[in-house]
Amino acid sequence: MKKEKKVTGYDKYINWKVFIFPVLALAVLLLIPTPNGMRDVGTQYQVGPKAVVNHLTRELFEVDSVDAAQWQLLTARIMETNMQMGALKKGRYLARDLKWCKKNKIDADSKNFELAFDFIKNEVDEDRFLSVMNSALDLRKQGLKYEELKGKDKAAADKGAWHIQVAIAVGAFVVLCFLTECIPLPAVAFCIGLLYVFTGVLSREAVAMLYWSDACWFIMGSLMFAAAFVKTGVDKRVCLAMFKKLAVPNTKWITLIFFIIIAPLAAFISDHALAAMFLPIGMLLYQNSLTDEVPEDKELAKLLMITIAMACNIGGPGAPSGGARNVIMMTYLTDMFGIDIGYFQWVTYCFPFVLVMIPITWFITNLRFRPKIISLAPAMDQLRTEIDKMGSWNRQQIWALVIFVIMVFGWFTEKSFYQMGIYPIRLGIGVIAVAGAIAYIITGVVNWRDYQEKVDWGVVWLYAGAIIFGRTLDSTGAAYWLARSVIDFLSQFGMESGLPLLMVSNGLTSVLTNLMADGPAAASVGPIALNMAGMVHPGTTYLPFMAMATAVASSFAYCLIIGTPPNAIVYASGYLEPKDYLRVGIPMFFVANVVLLLFTGIYWSFRG
């Protein structure tokens, strides 16, 4: 009898009875009058950069930006970009080079860069530099008033406010579509790009570039190499090596091993890579656990997939290398308040949080998913039998493993080697992942049919849409406006200091990180929360606690597929629905925030 094809979200048609609600939310948010707060933030983002550059050339060279020499203008632009990153100190400026300028889209040649570098190094002392940067920051945040703008500047501010309004409206549309599944999710990814083009927020060229960002290439390459592992049987050998020593290979022990291995590694290794490495192992465990008596156990499949994603998510805060969010908050703290947190010091404060979250997350995950199949001993026995039939490693398996090892080495070293000058160009982990996928074809490990049938291309497009959505929330200032509005509102109720401020900052960051990348989420909330903390708790340990807590909270992307790459990668297994993330994500969201508050109030306060 022919096995009936499994019905997934991709097989469903649009549900107009439900889809009308996201559409109405989008329309209402686009048509309401633009709030004044959006105009203020639009002024900061659209008029601010030009005004700041002009202010810097006046302060440093006593000329307007239009009359400044090329190297003087370059000096001001580098300082303005540094200011946006929260890097206010002279040392941060002197650490920049031509590669950094190119990455940040600042036109620079070696001659003008050397003139700018020498001027700052020799003519501007540390105190003078910091004073000028702080005055520029004050100008952008408080000195520019929408009501005082005229002509082109006012039109630019209005345009910026419209972009923020569109980003917020699209955000409501996307979240409702994801929660209700009223339209196939990859279609939502295309709706995001189309809405931004139709409303003038992004050009078609910008949208096309974002659809093929490095993160999207990484998702694609990861799913391709997972397909190669499954085809060759390497996943079976790795899986058996991991779990063969277990005396009682049941679901609870195996999921605990996943957490114990993945979560600590995620503090030092890319969570993208870990999710991609363990996905085929989780899928294999499920497929080999099925029997004639239990031909399908959806809860077991969901348990294994969610375990991999959650283990990746909780490990990131453990060390500065665990994510961009950690480095961003360290930079803000150093440049805004002169407080340095070293790598080891960060680990001693934040890695214990990871260790505490491992048993908590393991317990919640096993509580929310109750599989019929408890013992995976038959799966391990079947694995041994299949590997015995395979015999020794064949050519395809050796190539699959060798290419994978080279690819992982590239992921770990490409950034450092580029900075050291070993690699002449910055490759990015996405390019390396796709290069590995092509290497599998060149060596005859797979053919294109394998990729066509075994890679979930819908997930690739889904995450591409998520990249556009998150980047636009950040670049338009929509995330900053949302963060500022919430914190300003709650400050009216006495929540502008102490643990209440910490609770608001953590909660807001953890909401934003489910909608956008962790780095931009921390970058949006961090400066506002740190400034408020600096006013009410100057010179205290509260400031580094706020920085670390914001970074940790930005890892709480438990609730949506688009929240983090591991969530998207395990979704490609085909076993999960969007609501499955909420089953674990909602309790995890609240528990993680409570644990973080307790950590701050007890362990961090005790450490001082």
Model-assigned labels for residue ranges:
Residues P35-N36, A172-F190, V207, H272, ...:
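Flexible hinge motifs at transmembrane-helix junctions and intramembrane kinks/re-entrant loops
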